[in-house]
């Protein structure tokens, strides 16, 4: 059994009315990185996950979840 990390970054970003570029500037990464994270093509570092939690005002467990695959 394997696990996949899924996230709510796009939903949280849209709820704040931010563009990918605005979130990228706020967190110090490129817009392309934000795009890759939102599309589940890239799992961010712990440091970036904590930055997301800080800017969104929630815990990392509310942003990132493990989904089990069989």
Segment roles from a protein language model:
Residues 14, 28, 39, 68:
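Residue-level detection of the helix-turn-helix DNA-binding "recognition helix"
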Residues 1-15:
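A short, Lys/Arg-rich alpha-helix, primarily the initiator
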Residues 14, 25, 54:
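Alpha-helical residues within the helix-turn-helix
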Residues 18-36:
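Short alpha-helical DNA-recognition segment
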Residues 47-62:
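DNA major-groove recognition helix of helix-turn-helix/homeodomain DNA-binding modules
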Residues 7, 17-18, 44-47:
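Residue-level signal for the short linker/turn that defines the boundary of a DNA-recognition helix
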Residues 64-70:
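Short, charged recognition helix plus adjacent turn
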